[in-house]
């Protein structure tokens, strides 16, 4: 099999390695961890052998635990946000005029580190079931420093 374009061939990890439901994360079963078996010729950020997280609805299953997704469907790569994305703790968010303040959980940006306090404009973010949020680094105006 030769995977083409921006497609990722993947396999679900075992159930005991999947996100767990908690009091704050009641929709954990919507997200799945998968091992990347192969990638298409237009996939640059994800590599064979990586562990990725994505919504189960974005997996095109070809059997019970293997399938395909697009590189755009990936939320986390090896427990880090995709390139130029920042994972924030939405529960500590505070509004300051038109900007919001939040604490960074994880970042793939060179300028923003885990634990930084950032100020950003709300918009095209991706809210996860555990009430954390993935946003583009272009939404961030500044960090406390």
Protein language model features and the residues they cover:
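Acidic-enriched and Gly/Ser
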Residues: 1-145
């Amino acid at each position: 099999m030769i995977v083409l374009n921006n497609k990722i061939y993947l396999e679900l990890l075992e159930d005991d390695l999947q996100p767990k439901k908690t009091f704050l994360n009641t929709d954990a079963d919507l997200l799945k961890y998968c091992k990347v078996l192969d990638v298409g010729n237009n996939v640059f950020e994800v590599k064979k052998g990586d562990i990725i997280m994505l919504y189960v609805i974005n997996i095109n299953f070809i059997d019970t635990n293997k399938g395909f997704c697009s590189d755009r469907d990936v939320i986390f790569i090896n427990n880090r946000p995709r390139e130029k994305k920042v994972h924030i703790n939405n529960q500590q968010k505070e509004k300051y005029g038109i900007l919001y303040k939040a604490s960074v959980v994880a970042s793939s940006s060179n300028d923003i580190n885990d634990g930084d306090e950032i100020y950003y404009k709300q918009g095209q973010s991706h809210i996860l079931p555990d009430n954390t949020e993935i946003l583009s680094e272009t939404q961030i105006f500044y960090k406390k420093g």
